[in-house]
């Protein structure tokens, strides 16, 4: 008996649990629709200890500024996995939060650092109509997830990417190839790429500390 070619088809459902920090700005109880940011942390903050998320990025900013004017969700990636395989769960989380809180669906923003930068590129490319703007920091795409080609899905989504030129953990080229691919797609949305010539991997502290980032977010709104 020779080997025979066969096809097996099945549908598998799974349950995914994500712990997250949720920031609600003062006055949110008035019901006015607020802008929303989904923040994705880096690899070092994975696990089941939410305090790890407070070490870097937006949760750190919010801890020092409780009046931060955006609604912000900062989920924690479970140990031994990555954001890029959790994109459907992240989309479901955003949908749930939009339904439960006074969030403006036309002002949903996405950002992440390092592994969260990879997750931002991947999530936004998977659901290109979801976010009004995307800010990946020191991330990339990964050929095994179909990048850089997949990033063309974001040609009509405003993107502002950041990277340190001296980054030895995630090379600058990881972001550069995605930005170049976006430019070649000739989309309708603005593309910005900030390179910090003297910074290594931590290009997020200076970025999240800059008020211009949040002003730029607010200038982006889905029509």
Regions found by a protein language model. Name each.
Residues 65-67, 100-102, 129-130, 183-188:
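Short helix-capping segments at alpha-helix termini
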Residues 26-32, 78-115, 128-130:
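Gly/Ser-rich "nucleophile elbow"/oxyanion-hole loop immediately N-terminal to the catalytic nucleophile
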């Amino acid at each position: 008996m020779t080997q025979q070619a066969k096809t097996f088809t099945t549908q598998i459902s799974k349950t995914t649990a994500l712990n997250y920090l949720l920031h609600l700005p003062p006055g949110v109880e008035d019901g006015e629709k607020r802008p929303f940011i989904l923040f994705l942390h880096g690899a070092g903050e994975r696990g089941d200890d939410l305090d790890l998320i407070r070490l870097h990025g937006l949760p750190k900013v919010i801890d020092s500024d409780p009046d931060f004017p955006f609604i912000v969700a900062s989920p924690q990636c479970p140990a031994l996995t990555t954001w890029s395989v959790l994109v459907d769960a992240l989309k479901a989380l955003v949908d749930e939060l939009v339904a439960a809180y006074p969030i403006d669906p036309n002002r949903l923003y996405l950002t992440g650092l390092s592994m969260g930068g990879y997750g931002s590129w991947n999530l936004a490319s998977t659901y290109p109509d979801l976010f009004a703007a995307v800010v990946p920091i020191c991330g990339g795409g990964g050929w095994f997830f179909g990048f850089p080609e997949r990033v063309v899905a974001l040609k009509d989504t405003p993107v502002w990417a950041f990277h340190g030129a001296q980054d030895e953990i995630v090379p600058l080229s990881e972001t550069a190839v995605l930005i170049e691919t976006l430019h070649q797609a000739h989309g309708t949305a603005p593309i910005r790429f900030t390179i910090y010539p003297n910074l290594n991997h931590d290009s997020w502290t200076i970025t999240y500390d800059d008020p211009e980032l949040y002003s730029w977010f607010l200038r982006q709104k889905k029509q």
